[in-house]
Amino acid sequence: MSVQVEQKSYEMPPREGISIAYFLTVADVERSARYYEKVFGARILTMGDGNAPPYLQLANIWMILNVGGGPTPDKPTVTLSVPDPNHINSFMNFRVADIQACYKLWKSRGAQFITEPIPKYGETRCYIRDPDGYIIEVGQSTPDFKYG
């Protein structure tokens, strides 16, 4: 059983409704943009201009890459920095139809997997570490798994 989401468009910026952009604080925007392009086939929409960050489209999400920095008027107490690779508090989760095929393809393109795919909790999953230390979960649900 699949779950269908009704939305007419996933444009950025959205003309109606909502589109989600995942913001990653990275050490090197060029390196990170090229990584997501090479490994996962992300489409680089813009590399930014020094004032605006790069935007990428990856499957049904948008990604923003930025080097971060100190507080700004709209976030006066927040500093953005790359993560400590061993203490992560959020991560992307890629749901795939064929985890073994993705594992082989992405590994051949330079993805650094923490482990091979492992069966766990109604799915098979594994994790990738990107150049800045973020982890990305890759998971395939078992055929009998039900959403919702």
Question: Which sequence ranges carry the predicted segments?
Answer:
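Vicinal oxygen chelate
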Residues: 2-21, 43-94, 101-129, 141-148
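Short phosphate-engaging motifs
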Residues: 31-32, 98, 102
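Conserved active-site tyrosine of GNAT-family acetyltransferases
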Residues: 32-37, 106, 133
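Conserved beta-strand-loop-alpha-helix junction that forms the acyl-donor binding cleft
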Residues: 23-29
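Short glycine-/small-residue motifs
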Residues: 137-138
